[in-house]
Amino acid sequence: MDKKSSHPAGAARDILIELRNAGVYRDGRWLVRNVDLSVERGEIVTLIGPNGAGKSTAAKMALHILKPDEGMVSHKPGLRIGYVPQKINIDRTLPLSVERLMTLTGPLPRKEIDAALEAVGIAHLAKAETAHLSGGEFQRALMARALARKPDIMVLDEPVQGVDFSGEAALYELIARLRDDTGCGVLLISHDLHLVMAATDRVICLNGHVCCSGTPRDVTSSPEYVRLFGSRAVGPLAVYEHHHDHTHLPDGRVLYADGTTADPIAGSTMGPRGHCHVEDGHHHDHEHHHHEGGQPRA
């Protein structure tokens, strides 16, 4: 998937969220400090770091949930935020359909629910119980709930947690496509140092402070990153690169770069144009190539 430029030459920067020298102090220590971070319209920024690095604290500052004890946080006036939390407290033993999940935070017109579910590829699951969804399907439902409110920016906290590698790849493709289709900004938070989506415009590596930032390849080759995580962290770090001209939807259809969709050949894992069929949580290896440590992995 070709990455769109977040701010073409000569274009005015449309900053949605900005943190400047922001920090949070609690119980005699700084949870995070000196955080400089911004997300522009149409830009994907990925915040990575180990557990306890302050990623969630930084995200809460960005969302105005936490007030910084130093520095500042600013939002574009009238900013609409679509938030997909790391965890959502839902009793999975109680009946709750996907379409009902969509309205837990407020009513939505039926057409908006249908459009959002279609956009994330799970329109066929509108009546399904959330307890019966796979990890990838549930994440898509949460993204649809955020997307339905037409956000200027989506903040995704560990959106691929609990999803296997093929499911992660499908969700990363979806995130990039939603950015391309809507023009929204995306702030993605992840603890996984070994998988960064190639569609990311910038990566910010956090460990109590910003230790390095830049493109995925810039970050993994920076001396600060190597000092923090060790030379062994560089080799296995996988920068996910997907060179297909299509995205696989959970219902089996194939969405192509030109916006058309097609059904897979009955009884086959190959789509009508000869492409393999990837579902959230399952992956059949038909010449998919991922790059890990600079070496292709078939």
UniProtKB/Swiss-Prot annotation:
It catalyses: Zn(2+)(out) + ATP(in) + H2O(in) = Zn(2+)(in) + ADP(in) + phosphate(in) + H(+)(in). GO terms for molecular function: ABC-type zinc transporter activity; ATP binding; ATP hydrolysis activity. GO terms for biological process: response to zinc ion. Residues 276-298 have a biased composition (Basic and acidic residues). The keyword Cell inner membrane applies. InterPro entries: AAA+_ATPase, ABC_transporter-like_ATP-bd, ABC_transporter-like_CS, Metal_Ion_Import_ABC, P-loop_NTPase. GO terms for cellular component: plasma membrane. PROSITE patterns: ABC_TRANSPORTER_1, ABC_TRANSPORTER_2, ZNUC. It is found in: Cell inner membrane. The keyword Phosphoprotein does not apply. Its EC number is 7.2.2.20. Belongs to the ABC transporter superfamily. Zinc importer (TC 3.A.1.15.5) family. The complex is composed of two ATP-binding proteins (ZnuC), two transmembrane proteins (ZnuB) and a solute-binding protein (ZnuA). This is Zinc import ATP-binding protein ZnuC.
